[in-house]
Design a protein with these regions (language model features):
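Catalytic cores of soluble, metal-dependent hydrolases
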Residues: 1-8, 12-29, 52, 62, ...
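Long, hydrophobic, well-ordered secondary-structure blocks that form the structural core
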Residues: 30-42, 53
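Glycine- and acidic-residue-enriched helix-capping/strand-helix junction motifs
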Residues: 45-48
Length: 206
């Protein structure tokens, strides 16, 4: 089942979250922490990739009540709303999606949107560690600048809701790296994984 904390390997496999959420048969919110929106227009209509899976969940999952996207840059978020290129053009989808850009989190403006979060649904939490600064995580994609303590602070209100359906974490490093860098990256990621796992176990009561 989806209950518990699942590690999904590198961000290439983030589309597995879409498969996990297909198992949910009740109204729920997806809380997505990611440096990327994962809502590009699909290159091939019936194939799901790490770049478009979240957009497909938003458009097609009948049980999804809200998708809360935390961490991409403002310019990437604007792109998903653009009339020409964007995925989220209908009013229905716009109402389902709440976004908090890296810039809004840094400036404190994110607080203005908190009232938009629906609190009466269970949540599934998905974390891509590419949201973190390289001090905390070494991934195979471009990364954000968030610290681990800030990520934990942002997770806390969702964990305290006490109604967690499941949690997944991706963002491991690329295996084709030269060995010294790979070992160093594995060490950084291992420490962050342990810290995140302990934190999530403690506060989510999974």
């Amino acid at each position: 089942g989806i209950r518990g904390i699942h590690f999904l390997d590198s961000g290439n496999y983030h589309y597995v979250t879409g498969i996990m959420t297909e198992q949910i048969k009740q109204g729920f919110s997806l809380i997505l922490f990611d440096h990327h929106t994962d809502m590009q227009k699909p290159m091939i209509e019936h194939m799901t990739s790490c770049g478009d899976w979240a957009g497909k969940v938003l458009k097609t999952n009948p049980w999804l009540q809200q998708l809360i996207l935390i961490g991409p840059q403002e310019r990437d978020i604007q792109q998903i709303y653009s009339e020409k290129e964007g995925l989220v053009t209908s009013t229905e989808l716009r109402e389902k999606l709440v976004t908090f850009s890296a810039e809004e989190i840094q400036s404190g403006e994110a607080g203005n949107k908190i009232s938009k979060i629906k609190k009466n649904f269970p949540v599934y939490i998905s974390i891509d560690k590419d949201i973190l600064d390289e001090e905390y995580s070494e991934t195979n994609w471009s990364q954000g600048k968030m610290s681990l303590p800030v990520l934990e602070r942002l997770l806390m209100p969702f964990l305290k809701s006490g109604n967690i359906l499941g949690i997944d974490i991706c963002g491991e490093c690329q295996q084709g790296m030269p060995l010294p860098q790979y070992l160093e990256a594995e060490e950084i990621n291992g420490e962050t994984n342990k810290e995140l796992f302990d934190f999530l176990m403690h506060y989510s009561h999974m």
